[in-house]
């Protein structure tokens, strides 16, 4: 009791102290070209400085500075570094304010090169074609730049050497964990990197909208709205192997003497565990390292939508509004900091619907004031006057979920260890057609299977091909206003959310084909809730 096989401790508990400067300016003007045509235009200037750590502890992995001749040798199938054979800082660059022996000083002074100046033009036009004030046509275009958060830089500070190292003592005991001689782990180390030629992400927005007023109380509009994202951020794992590469390479197949050699991957072999894939550490692009999480501004997106709105006003404050959107949002980046393509050598193969894409969104909201005893005179007037019913009814289709598989790497990518990349299965049929839509099986789970042995490729199922459950919701409020004086009133409110207590399913227990809960629903949105409120209006 109290004996440990291994005790591990990080050398430092580092807290990032990051800084960055930014300069922004904006100019806008409006030109009435004709009495019924107005043009507005502007320009926004943005310059975002390189983030840096005040203490100079920000290092970055730059593939251009990796020297294979300085890389660690790997101990055969054990997949560990051989002590004394390589430069532990190979490929790493460090801030010029805090140089470290054996490391390359950043040619940029900081972790990345200075980002360029950004100019974002905007232009819009409003046209009243009939000069009656009842019809308008609007169009617009603009470019909008985005300043990336500090999150990836904080990961670098807390992960990359030389300012973070790990001591391992093994074996040891609970009452004396530091007994013995600590050694630096020889396991390959994961790294974080940021593209040194970092480009500022930007989005182009454009729109064309037609609006018409029918009479004095009805307004209808319909328009096309689109956008395109460029240089969007996303993670890659630079140390994954190309599919089939391991088949053509020779590896040391043991870690003892005498050494034996053979193919790194045999014909028809499917890697099913991280232990089996340790042999691939000998042929990784950046030998001596594990996963290399690399933030690149190489991803794109596009969005197209039809948006329709209608409003009808009635007497007093009564009105009803309807809004409908049909849209399509596509991208090759799932999540800028968390997910990685299953094959970083072909991240364009990730192009699919965005994780937050909803094809149909319908919303109806209304307010109805009972037209009785508005002046609230007398006992009957105070009782029957001042009542109002309002509510929101909404419906939207589900978001997409990605199928997954585990312990399966027929392509020999080397993603079963510490790599953040996840594998997907093969696509056999559309899982949403004739889907059972049961809690125990929402979609057709037979539509996915592991790639067959010997194909030496990743699964061909796309991201977010499983359509999640839709949402239908009815919310309403019954309010009673009691006039206290000419300028004061008391409002009593009874608010009900999800009036019909309709069950709206949300997420799956698992979309991994190897899971025992594959395809099952495990969560719902809020049930019916009510609340009472009162407020004084003055």
Descriptions of predicted regions:
Residues 43-51, 55-56, 140-148, 225-228, ...:
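Short, solvent-exposed turn/loop segments enriched in Gly/Ser/Thr/Pro and often Arg
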Residues 1-130, 337-341:
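Signature of Gram-negative outer-membrane beta-barrel scaffolds
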Residues 19, 36-37, 48-50, 171-177, ...:
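Short, solvent-exposed micro-motifs at the edges of structured domains
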Residues 6, 61, 155-161, 534:
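Charge-dense, low-complexity polyampholytic segments
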